[in-house]
Every structure is written in C-alpha cells, then in structure tokens.
Amino acid sequence: MATHLPTASIITIGDELLIGQTIDTNSAFIAQELNRIGIWVRRRVAVGDQAEEIRNALDQEAMKSDLILITGGLGPTADDMTKPLLCDYFGGKLVRDESVLKHIEYLFQEVYRRPGALLERNKRQADVPDVCE
C-alpha cells in the first residue's frame, strides 16, 4: 500500500523579491525543514505585494497542497497588507499577540537600544490573524 506524503506549497510575498532587491532565503530554509520532517514541497511561488496576485496564489495552491506556508509581506510599511488580506480570505480578524509584542518591545529596548523608537506601526507587527495556525 502506497503512503501519501503530506504536501506543502510555500508562497513568498514581496515586490522586492520579484525585482531581485532581496534574495529569498526564507523559502529555501522552510523547504529544507519541511523535507527533513517528511513533508514534500510541491511548489515555491513568489508574488508581489498585490492583493489579486496573493489571492490567486492562495486559490491555486489550496487546491493542490495539504499545507500552505506564507512568508514576506509582513513589514511595518504601508504596502504590506498580507495579514489583513489573509483575514479577509479566511474570514478572520487581526488580534494582538501579547507574547509577540513583548518580544518586539524587548528587541527595541535591549537589542536595538532604542526604547523610545517603538511606534504603533512596529506594534502592529504583533497583530496576527486569529484563523491561522
């Protein structure tokens, strides 16, 4: 009897990836780790910061893979709309994860040594879709 390996698709988001401004090392690392635990990565897809492109990638990969991992499009800038888009797509809402917020505060205070520089846009990095696992 043949066994079915779980399958995954990795979607990377960001115009900077498409134009070569940033090298995508995240999806390579994720693919290696998934392979190590017995999950077959069937596709790695890069899309820009356009809502329609992200939705299309989600639609296509959801039909073919057991698991979809998304990386990128999560910075504190205005064009990073991945989290609100995912909430809309999956029917959830953004909630602030206090443990993530504490980590961000730690980074600003202890690592960057800029405690007063923590802005609301940085705090929004701790907002996560309540429907994602």
Per-range role (PLM):
Residues 43-53:
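Short beta->alpha junction loops
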Residues 33-36, 76-86:
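A short glycine/small-residue-enriched secondary-structure motif
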Residues 2-45:
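Glycine-rich phosphate/diphosphate-binding loop of Rossmann-like nucleotide-binding domains
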Residues 65:
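An anion/phosphate-binding loop that grips the pyrophosphate of nucleotide cofactors and donors
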